[in-house]
Amino acid sequence: MPTKIPRNDYAAMYGPTTGDRVRLADTDLIIEVERDLTTYGEEVKFGGGKVIRDGMGQSQVTRAQCAVDTVITNALIVDHSGIYKADVGLKDGRIHKIGKAGNPDTQPNVDIIIGPGTEAIAGEGRILTAGGFDAHIHFICPQQIEDSLHSGITTMLGGGTGPAHGTLATTCTPGPWHIGRMLQSLDAFPMNFGLSCKGNASQPEALVEMVSAGACAMKLHEDWGTTPGAIDCCLSVADEMDVQVMIHTDTLNESGFVENTLAAIGDRTIHAFHTEGAGGGHAPDIMKVVGYENILPSSTNPTMPYTVNTLEEHLDMLMVCHHLDKSIPEDVAFAESRIRKETIAAEDILHDMGAFSVMASDSQAMGRVGEVIIRTWQTADKMKKQRGRLAEETGDNDNARVMRYIAKYTINPALVHGMSREIGSIEEGKRADLVLWSPAFFGVKPEMSLIGGTIVMAQMGDPNASIPTPQPVYSRPMFGAFGRAVERSAVLFVSEAAQAAGIGDQLGLAKDTLAVKSTRDIRKSDMIHNSFRPDIHVDPETYDVRANGELLTCEPATDLPLAQRYFMY
């Protein structure tokens, strides 16, 4: 007969349920469970004396009869689509079903069948998110990949060939030969990848050649000459070949001002990198592009959030990244023109308003590859403390703000780059690129990461201990990060032209290749929870930023969550 148990006891046993609230790490962000897809009294849980046993929560159904490969039980899902509790069934490396797991022979309402061939991951008291997507990578060194993976990222997009000086400054893998070598190298790592080629050319032939060789995007960078002619040529090729274009505009305004760049772009879709400007772009008013429907604005993480240390560290970073010389006054003036506290402060607020749509790193080129997720949540926390609740919030929680910020490094970059049918959210049919977090470590240190349904990284104690938990516990690569499992779990994103030409066979790639699609009809209004288009004015003398006439300014943070408390060693 049914019985009731205290809510605290239930949460301790099966995780939080509808109406329960959870704090995210040491931030002031509180989420509330909106709904629970499991069935009270019929929850499945693995362990001695628990439910997932033969004839109880485990059925006799074979894999061929639709039992799942893996079940994640009682997970608290935090996604752009909502904050809710469910069991998640994985099969063939994809999310098979989100709902209620168990044995249909003994339990009601079961839509995820647990069989003898099903592995169990305990999601009770854990948060489940889609793997993060960092869409601004300088492939300067392969060690970045490990740092990124261990922070909760499962997909990286960018360009480069290693520590060549072109790569140190620009996210471009130039030419078919380099693209081929990089794709062959990236075959070896437990991470999904896409490469961007150089987009700076005034004639289309070389750009077509690079996209056909496997690049899934093109990058226009001022260090290669982002002139109106190059912008027009690059976008014309992109429209023809269905790949995205990322742009780093002309800081010095040598070949034109922001208005000239906007005229060259026209109404064509483009992904605007570090749209605040410290990372590069028309000084001082590149930020005005956030108001355009065809421009998809992103930030890189060194300016996020604005703190008392932000300005001081940026000048030296910029000199190194762009191969500048402190003994040349013009180089110093170039660097100083990009670092403006007024626009950096406004960037925080525009993210909170949903005007900036994407967060990325700019790895080792004025950005930290392992801090995309950390800095996203630090910004959300800073904005809650400084600006209060969002008008969109309902109830005593921060669900709307949390969904806005998680979209910035999951679904929105996937939409921008034509990958959203495969990655970016927890949806049935998408790849099982998933990250499990303890709420106390949310945003800082993932408990476990899966790519294509295979565990590639997890917190693990001393391997020589009698149990997995003795210290030192830290994130370590798991079986999915080794051998042939890497090849079958992660993928390489390429252009449709390269996919049709059989680029995988041409280069002898072991990973599957997937073509990006529908990159040219994405608009700002498609950016989930981040589609606000204010009219931006930047004062050319004071650098004050106004959105729809409202002055945007905030104080720099003097301390942040998700910081030294979590990194004592």
From Swiss-Prot:
> Sites of the modification N6-carboxylysine?
K219
Q: What is the protein's major site of localization?
A: cytoplasm
Q: Name one GO biological process term.
A: urea catabolic process
Which cofactors must be present for this protein to function?
Ni cation
Task: Specify the domain of life of the species encoding this protein.
Answer: Bacteria
Molecular-function GO term, any one: urease activity
UniProt binding sites for Ni(2+) 2? K219, H248, H274
PTM annotation, UniProt: Carboxylation allows a single lysine to coordinate two nickel ions.
- Which sites bind substrate? H221
Catalytic site residues? H322
Annotated GO CC locations: cytoplasm
Q: Where does Ni(2+) 1 bind?
A: H136, H138, K219, D362
Question: EC number(s) on record?
Answer: 3.5.1.5
Print the keywords alphabetically.
Cytoplasm, Hydrolase, Metal-binding, Nickel
Localization, per the record, is: Cytoplasm
Spell out the reaction equation it catalyses.
urea + 2 H2O + H(+) = hydrogencarbonate + 2 NH4(+)
A Pfam family (short name) is Urease_alpha
* Cofactor stoichiometry and binding remark: Binds 2 nickel ions per subunit.
**Which InterPro entries does this entry report, sorted A to Z?**
Amidohydro-rel (IPR006680), Metal-dep_hydrolase_composite (IPR011059), Metal_Hydrolase (IPR032466), Urease_alpha_N_dom (IPR011612), Urease_alpha_subunit (IPR050112), Urease_AS (IPR017950), Urease_asu (IPR005848), Urease_asu_c (IPR017951)
Task: Indicate the segments forming the Urease domain, all copies.
Answer: 131-569
* UniProt KW Iron-sulfur keyword: no
The pathway is: Nitrogen metabolism; urea degradation; CO(2) and NH(3) from urea (urease route): step 1/1
Subunit: Heterotrimer of UreA (gamma), UreB (beta) and UreC (alpha) subunits. Three heterotrimers associate to form the active enzyme.
What's the protein name?
Urease subunit alpha
Q: Which organism is it from?
A: Jannaschia sp. (strain CCS1)
Upper lineage is: Bacteria, Pseudomonadati, Pseudomonadota, Alphaproteobacteria, Rhodobacterales
UniProt lists the gene as ureC
